[in-house]
């Protein structure tokens, strides 16, 4: 359990950080590079930030929407001449745990994929514990609805009395098809964090030829083919859509504290997720 008591972490009234240090290592999904990653407590109002230990000067990359550069099959941040990729699962876990301030030390260009979900991150955070800080967490109100479209795909944020995430997908694979899910913050740790990333067997060779999924394997991603799942069992019957919702929450975490709203997405992508986050950030100006 998370050590700090009181309100649900996502709606806590004060900022939070880690009670200690947590460490992981693993391969990057796209780079295939082995990387070590350490979470360190950070002072109030620091925010979430990456530090590239392997680069001269150890440049800092804020986990903020302003730092987003690329969203091709993952979210990449760039700042101070450095980059870090595939940040969404870790950021989702930090947001689920209610961690506002943390220094993320990393020895390479991509966050390890681990098992393809946010569960290993969340379990490590829970082992260390989370502590409240004296600084208040800002209450962020969505002023008006925001919707971003791209063909049939869309993502929306609608003012609401409580935070809720709803996601829909539709793939021409019998094993997936059309799926919808909807969760509140208190359900994310158990119902969404364990959902793993997924891909399609027919695309593997092409993506690898493009320099992508170099670290992908049947141990860190679900793979779907025309005849069904290559590496069952699934953790949930609708695991793919739950993972897409996890990606959305990780991308919205780039706002720091996302506004209380009902977020609805259909056939969306990291590009649409981050476009929504940018539009919400503009409301704050």
Curated annotation (Swiss-Prot):
Origin: domain of life: Bacteria
Record: residues binding Zn(2+): 89, 243, 247
GO CC, alphabetical: membrane
Coiled coil (UniProt feature): none
InterPro entries linked: Ribosomal_Su5_D2-typ_SF, UDP-acyl_GlcNac_deAcase, UDP-acyl_GlcNac_deAcase_C, UDP-acyl_N-AcGlcN_deAcase_N
Single biological process term from Gene Ontology: lipid A biosynthetic process
A GO molecular-function annotation: metal ion binding
Active-site residue numbers: 270
Reaction catalyzed: a UDP-3-O-[(3R)-3-hydroxyacyl]-N-acetyl-alpha-D-glucosamine + H2O = a UDP-3-O-[(3R)-3-hydroxyacyl]-alpha-D-glucosamine + acetate
Pathway(s): Glycolipid biosynthesis; lipid IV(A) biosynthesis; lipid IV(A) from (3R)-3-hydroxytetradecanoyl-[acyl-carrier-protein] and UDP-N-acetyl-alpha-D-glucosamine: step 2/6
Function: Catalyzes the hydrolysis of UDP-3-O-myristoyl-N-acetylglucosamine to form UDP-3-O-myristoylglucosamine and acetate, the committed step in lipid A biosynthesis.
Record-given protein name: UDP-3-O-acyl-N-acetylglucosamine deacetylase
Provenance organism: Thermosynechococcus vestitus (strain NIES-2133 / IAM M-273 / BP-1)
